[in-house]
């Protein structure tokens, strides 16, 4: 066997492996790798827990948003119903007011017509009385006038009673 550089390299390599085994480097490396694996596993578990928590929060907020939207929709619908009711009530009151005012106006018109007819009749009666008075005064004597006056007075009394 030759003691050349390859032999010394092999002996150095074997001594290096023996030294590493003596110092329990593979155990330390294994422990370090196990610790690192445990840390990564814990971080993954924490990340999973946080993700689930975030998903539950998102679901809760979406549920609350849907509830709020439903409540807003019901409020809008109630407001629309109330507005329609108020509009219908206002329309009904306006129609009633217009009907009352129309009836009152018609009543006033009828009263004015009646007053005008009565005034025309009274004026016609006064004119007829005046004309009759003039005709009778010019053509009748005192006894005939007295008889006509008494007859007319009797007719007026009978119509008034």
Swiss-Prot record:
One of its GO terms (molecular function) is proton-transporting ATPase activity, rotational mechanism. It is a single-pass membrane protein. Its main location: membrane. The keyword Cell inner membrane applies. CDD domains: ATP-synt_Fo_b (cd06503). The chain crosses the membrane at residues 3-23. Keywords: ATP synthesis, Cell inner membrane, Cell membrane, CF(0), Hydrogen ion transport, Ion transport, Membrane, Transmembrane, Transmembrane helix, Transport. It is found in: Cell inner membrane. The keyword Transport applies. It holds the Pfam family ATP-synt_B. GO terms for cellular component: plasma membrane; proton-transporting ATP synthase complex. Belongs to the ATPase B chain family. F(1)F(0) ATP synthase produces ATP from ADP in the presence of a proton or sodium gradient. F-type ATPases consist of two structural domains, F(1) containing the extramembraneous catalytic core and F(0) containing the membrane proton channel, linked together by a central stalk and a peripheral stalk. During catalysis, ATP synthesis in the catalytic domain of F(1) is coupled via a rotary mechanism of the central stalk subunits to proton translocation. Component of the F(0) channel, it forms part of the peripheral stalk, linking F(1) to F(0). F-type ATPases have 2 components, F(1) - the catalytic core - and F(0) - the membrane proton channel. F(1) has five subunits: alpha(3), beta(3), gamma(1), delta(1), epsilon(1). F(0) has three main subunits: a(1), b(2) and c(10-14). The alpha and beta chains form an alternating ring which encloses part of the gamma chain. F(1) is attached to F(0) by a central stalk formed by the gamma and epsilon chains, while a peripheral stalk is formed by the delta and b chains. NCBIfam families: PRK09173.1. PANTHER family: ATP SYNTHASE SUBUNIT B (PTHR33445:SF1), ATP SYNTHASE SUBUNIT B', CHLOROPLASTIC (PTHR33445). This is ATP synthase subunit b 1. The lineage of its organism: Bacteria, Pseudomonadati, Pseudomonadota, Alphaproteobacteria, Hyphomicrobiales.
């Amino acid at each position: 066997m030759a003691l050349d550089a390859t032999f010394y390299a092999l002996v150095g390599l074997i001594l290096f492996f023996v030294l590493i085994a003596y110092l329990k480097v593979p155990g330390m490396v294994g422990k370090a790798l196990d610790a690192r694996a445990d840390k990564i596993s814990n971080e993954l578990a924490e990340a999973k827990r946080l993700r689930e928590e975030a998903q539950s929060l998102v679901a809760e907020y979406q549920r609350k948003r849907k509830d709020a939207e439903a409540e807003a929709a019901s409020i809008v619908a109630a407001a629309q119903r109330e507005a329609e009711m108020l509009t219908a009530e206002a329309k009904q009151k306006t129609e009633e007011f217009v009907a009352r005012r129309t009836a009152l106006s018609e009543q006033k018109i009828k009263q004015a017509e009646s007053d005008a007819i009565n005034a025309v009749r009274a004026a016609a009666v006064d004119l007829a009385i005046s004309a009759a008075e003039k005709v009778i005064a010019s053509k009748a004597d005192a006894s005939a006038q007295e008889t006509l006056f008494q007859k007319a007075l009797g007719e007026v009394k009978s119509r008034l009673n």
